[in-house]
Amino acid sequence: VLKFDKGWLTAMRDVGKILEFPVAMYIIDHPRGLLLYDTGMNAAVSDGKCESYWGKGLCSAFMPIQRRDQVIDKWLEKFGYSVDDVKYVVTSHMHLDHAGNMEMFPKAVHVLQKAELKAAWWPEKFQRAAFVLKDYDNARDFNYLQLDGDFDLFGDGSVVVLDTKGHTQGHQSLMVKLKNTGTLFLAGDAVYTPENEAGVIPG
């Protein structure tokens, strides 16, 4: 969970109102291999240890709340998997609450937009704050599937990566077709609040 000012997300409407936002990670068991959408906040910010990893400024701004047993490797264990079972990691974008544990998955194929990789490893000055390079600096030699737009991951329409740039230069969302549930749209940070969907663009 992150806690921060709603005004950041609604072009300063309701500024000063502090909301809690879940840090979502998704485990998708597909016949072609186990897939993750986002890896959440780094394990190092767990149990009140944020400042030693993110620094005081980021911790004060985002106020993360995370127990060690809420990190993605522990969630995988709860469902009977290990980090080595993961075949694909689709990362919505490289911000600190979405790409924090990429380095846990050296055996996976990492699916990202080319523009996002460039923005994360060589960020512009005004974009640097939410990219934590040490989250993924040791992942430079991982196996990347670098995209330039939408992509049908398995070629059957069951998992489609959608280019939803805006929040970052290479933000991507995921459309997943489930047999019993139907089609789900995993938006990442493309839509935060009902106001965004109604036309109030994210701040």
Where are each of the predicted segments found?
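Short aromatic-enriched loop/helix-cap "lid" or pocket-rim segments at secondary-structure transitions
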Residues: 8, 47-50, 122-125, 196-200
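Metallo-beta-lactamase
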Residues: 42, 62-97, 104, 113-165, ...
